[in-house]
Amino acid sequence: MAMAMALRKLSSSVNKSSRPLFSASSLYYKSSLPDEAVYDKENPRVTWPKQLNSPLEVIDPEIADIIELEKARQWKGLELIPSENFTSLSVMQAVGSVMTNKYSEGYPGARYYGGNEYIDMAETLCQKRALEAFRLDPAKWGVNVQPLSGSPSNFQVYTALLKPHDRIMALDLPHGGHLSHGYQTDTKKISAVSIFFETMPYRLDESTGYIDYDQLEKSATLFRPKLIVAGASAYARLYDYARIRKVCDKQKAVLLADMAHISGLVAAGVIPSPFDYADVVTTTTHKSLRGPRGAMIFFRKGLKEVNKQGKEVFYDYEDKINQAVFPGLQGGPHNHTITGLAVALKQATTPEYRAYQEQVLSNSSKFAKALSEKGYDLVSGGTENHLVLVNLKNKGIDGSRVEKVLELVHIAANKNTVPGDVSAMVPGGIRMGTPALTSRGFVEEDFVKVAEYFDAAVSLALKVKAESKGTKLKDFVEALQTSSYVQSEISKLKHDVEEFAKQFPTIGFEKATMKYNK
């Protein structure tokens, strides 16, 4: 009885006339739709599509104005932070595209969501281009392009290849290393890496400013690490990957090269590549590589060796690393970032990109020379990459105070620890780099001028320090804010810096479209 009633109801429903969704020839019908067009602007069925398709300046003028202010800052200032760059318009277009809308947990061809045909295409193309950019054989190397940033990518490698409380060696943070390599003090585990793994630093030879490889080898013999990191955030010299490879082989340790800072230089082939020696290579994608904010993990695959028994031994990194990324430590990847990265990696294989990276090195060398000629003490005595690390102690001032003055005159640099510092809270150095300004078209002679502005800021900082009523940083800041003479000098230097910087092109946006373009 119930079945018969259900069938009669279904038959009645089927026999009802249906109106087309768009037109009489449309394949899609639905009886409940009104006669007028669904997206009739004058008589909309719903109101939110209009809001969703309105531009930012209409929907949120406050945020739009903040973005315009940031554009003006980038145009009028000198960006010297070595971990920053100006990515291209095409990369930003990809990052701001509809690719941000899609969820895609899993990997190409093996997703936990439907509708990923084009997401798979973008990620696969990104992987292909990543291997091509670094001239890698896809039979010997693989790459995961899903890590959200550099620190997570390093932790994903540790999680994949180590057991809890296994041992890691890496360059000490005050000597140029990075937090994600397991930094800790005598009293506190600063990085979470040092909570889950046992870490020991290797350091520079303070008499030369170069990594002390002899001491590294001795420490490794005693510590017996399972993994050694070759990578830095404030080391102006090239790594001796071959030397660390020998130490790793002796200890049967994994060699992880973290090339976050230098990957653009490596891609262009203007400095030695870690891929000849490393087992795993990580990198961020937004520093010298000049892509969107993300990261990659490269790993060896295929035949590793033939053992003493004549048996072939293969690398087992691929599955372990992929599983550590997802589902181990991440959910859905950021597909808009991966798409933007694919664009950046295509750019990284062009002649223009190599010319840019060559200029980055030339500018860095000239900048270092100009600073040295002005009496500045450079850690290691110079540079072989994109950055310089200035030890300010011989000038009688520290990085924190100089950074405050630089900020006020529109020069962006960052305070940094240098060998011999007793506190990371009062670092003795300033870290500066050339990638961002080189993207804007700066050449060697321009960095001589930048060195002059830096020197003027340091001189001003010394005057402020002399006028300070106390020895603490807050006393210095108070003098900055209250001295009419200091305010006048800052205003003059800021004006000179801005007029100089405004001569150069903007990257990613046109001056003519800026709200604050005066």
Curated annotation (Swiss-Prot):
SUPFAM superfamilies: PLP-dependent transferases. Disulfide bonds: none annotated. One of its GO terms (biological process) is glycine biosynthetic process from serine. It catalyses: (6R)-5,10-methylene-5,6,7,8-tetrahydrofolate + glycine + H2O = (6S)-5,6,7,8-tetrahydrofolate + L-serine. It is found in: Mitochondrion. Its main location: mitochondrion. Residues 1-31 form a transit peptide. It is an enzyme of class 2 (transferase). Its EC number is 2.1.2.1. GO terms for molecular function: glycine hydroxymethyltransferase activity; pyridoxal phosphate binding. Its cofactor is pyridoxal 5'-phosphate. Keywords: Mitochondrion, One-carbon metabolism, Pyridoxal phosphate, Transferase, Transit peptide. InterPro entries: PyrdxlP-dep_Trfase, PyrdxlP-dep_Trfase_major, PyrdxlP-dep_Trfase_small, Ser_HO-MeTrfase, Ser_HO-MeTrfase-like, Ser_HO-MeTrfase_PLP_BS, SHMT-like_dom. Pathway: One-carbon metabolism; tetrahydrofolate interconversion. Pfam families: SHMT. The modification N6-(pyridoxal phosphate)lysine is found at residue 287. GO terms for cellular component: mitochondrion. It comes from the Eukaryota. NCBIfam families: PRK00011.1. Catalyzes the interconversion of serine and glycine. Homotetramer. Belongs to the SHMT family. This is Serine hydroxymethyltransferase, mitochondrial.
